[in-house]
Amino acid sequence: MLNTHIRKLKVFIIAVLILSGCATIANLDLNKLYGDENSENRASANIEQASSPSSASQFFEDDVAPIIEQRCVVCHACYDAPCQLKMSSPEGIERGANKEKVYHGDRLLAATPNRLFMDALNPIAWRERGFYPVLNERQQNPVANTQASVLAKMLQLKQQHPLPKDKLLDDRFDVSIDRSQECPTIQEFSAYADSQPFAGMPYALPELTSDEHNTLMTWIEQGAYMPNRAPISAEQQQAVDNLEGFLNADSLNMQLSARYIYEHLFTTHLYFKELVEPHTQPQFYNLVRSRTPIGEPIDIIASRRPFDKPDVSRVYYRLQPVVSTIVTKTHQPYAIDKSLLDKWQSWFVDAEYNVISMPSYEPEVAANPLIAFAQLPVNARYRFMLERAQNTIMGYIKGPVCRGQVALNVINDHFWVYFVEPEVATSPELNAFYESQRDNLRLPAEQESTALAVNWVEYAKRQGDYVRARHKFMNSAVEGGQQLSIDDIWNGDGNNDNASLTIFRHFDNASVIKGLVGAPPKTAWVIDYPLLERVHYLLVAGFDVYGNYGHQLLTRLYMDFLRLEGEANFLAFLPPKSRSEVHKSWYQKAGPELTSFMQGKVNKFDQPSGIEFTTKNYKEELFDMFAEHLKSVQPNEYKIKDSKLSHNNKALLAELNKLQGFSASILPELSMIMVELENSDTPEIFTLVRNSAHYNVNSLFFEEDNRDFQNDNVTLVHGLLGSYPDVFWHVKEADIAKLVAKAQEIKT
């Protein structure tokens, strides 16, 4: 046995040496033919092209960029872009590729962050960080530009080995989320092409058309020039200056307020609503921390987290124009207008409070917003997050944490979210209670990015202490005559459609939309101020995608506590005797540890609410009462009745909502349906969402064992929902009845 292992090891070592030798020989050949590889060669050629009149800029903007955006960006835009090659901007293409994976959940030590536009700013710096070019960086001539370019070789490989005509891809194609990756340099490409002939670009998708391919190859042959962007307009610059002026006022009150605003908006795309032209994409901005004040070029403080120590005496909050292609899976649009700025003025400037000194950036302070921002009014903090509640939750749903099965199996596939009324959530009594619980509400990010998973026990104890203290506080409040009522749920002040949200999980990604969409779900959350704050600081501000296994596991396990807390808040509105019964239905087959935690800590609030029920279907009746309470702020999106289908066809298509059980479980996570109308040239779009049922969502692994297939169902909505469609159905309106009938017959 030992000899067998030794022989296998020898074979492996020999193979590695052969491949390394081949790459070395290839490099020598390339050096001989086209000179040494040096990113300054491309930089010099780009400067020369930029300084001389040329049609290259127009060619890129009019012909090349649209192809890249339509055929390349869909895979090459996010942290999980293959080989870290981001093609959503010229800077990403110039940066090149890297063999390391960003999503590497079992790493023992935190990795070095490699964030575009932040951790390095030019190709030379990226080469020092292990990135290699995909464009030619040797002699700049037409032959070298194609023969020494990984991108050109990838495109040619696809043309030589196009996608098979089979309806389903075979085992040669792996599109799973945790697939292995091969990231060849130009020196390694020959061996790569021999071993993976069908791995050209676009991978696992149809090849480029002849015109598209020729356009990109011509561009690469001519030097792959990508022009500098025009500066923003004077009108945009004035709006930027005004907002930066507001955020960088000198008072301590405003310095702390700006820090709070930044730490909640650093993942969003801000835009000035009043400056958006009809039918045009807004100019978006990232809010960043800079070493330099207004009027000087931005010098980004490239910290792992938004609350890490900046190592400067004064932080400036600046607006950096977004220059990458906008993609839905990371896009969090955040409109800035006079109405919003007036509210910020009211909450953070006009309110009566006094910041004595700026809080520390030490992890045990900065990672806990209830400590770091204790000097800001609770009402200001809660109102700020509620005003754009979808965006607040979207930071989790569209951020880097929300990717992969293990990251998402902490939530149910479909649930509704409500919020506690601000006047209730920010009362002086509650404020004093939050102050007393600051230590119990500490978050895993204080352990930074190389953490030990065993620390979970410490956080579990603190969460248990907090829940017990909270229920004691609530019991005392109810005994004092302050019973829960429907009015304790925020109604959006009668005009804000962020008052209720629907969250859909699509196995390894998720969506959050405004309003109560779909049939009444199995579970729901009611979120108060400390819960909303901790969701953000656990999953957005405090999460480091480059963190080690312990950090990522702690984050996932702590999220169990927050889910349980939100669900317990909802249960508190039900009659006391029904709470345990409903909760048990949500956590069937739960492990003994969870059962002990829930029964010993979560369900100790046993005071009656002030709500009178008229049926025994308490949960459904509560949903109805909440819906009535929020009816004036329900958005009109996603309603089938608002489509342009005929009345009969609306009713027919809505029959899909009745699919359930095993028939529903066979469907893809997201099905996009395009219906060609009988009386219009503009098609109608619908999305069919599969909701997978579970006995409980508390198991980190072995999710399949917790699946409750017989209770799977679907939600049909009008319009597009989700970022990762699995299948597209193209149907004529006259054939809707046939489509529905076929869907109802699905058995395997």
Descriptions of predicted regions:
Residues 23-748:
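Aromatic- and Gly/Pro-enriched helix-to-coil junctions and flexible linker segments
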Residues 19-21:
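C-terminal motif of bacterial Sec signal peptides marking the signal peptidase cleavage site
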Residues 2-13:
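Bacterial N-terminal signal peptides that target proteins for export
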